[in-house]
Amino acid sequence: MKAWREDYSNHRVRAVIEEYIHSTRDRALILDSLVDGLSYDELAERYSLTYEGVKDVMKKGRAALDRHY
C-alpha cells in the first residue's frame, strides 16, 4: 500500500470515498477523519466503536484511495 499522501485534495478524497465505500457509517467515519481531522479516539466515541474498529475502517478507506485516487 502506498504511504498516505498529505497532498490529496479534500474534494478528490471525498469523491473517491463516496464512490468506493458503500457503508454509510464507514463513509462518514472516513470523511470525518481525513477531511475534518477527527482523531481515532474521537471517531471511536462518535461511532460507538473501539479504537481497533476505527483503525479497520480507516484501513479500508486508505486502501480505496490508494487504488482509485
Placement of each model-derived feature along the sequence:
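Helix-turn-helix DNA-binding helix
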Residues: 54-55
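C-terminal flanking helix
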Residues: 62-69
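Short alpha-helical "recognition helix" segments of helix-turn-helix
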Residues: 42-47
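Conserved tyrosine-mediated DNA breakage-rejoining catalytic core shared by Y-recombinases
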Residues: 58-59
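Charged, low-cysteine interdomain linkers and short loop/connector segments
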Residues: 1-3
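Short amphipathic alpha helix immediately N-terminal
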Residues: 22-38
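Short, Lys/Arg-enriched anionic-surface-contact patches
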Residues: 5-25
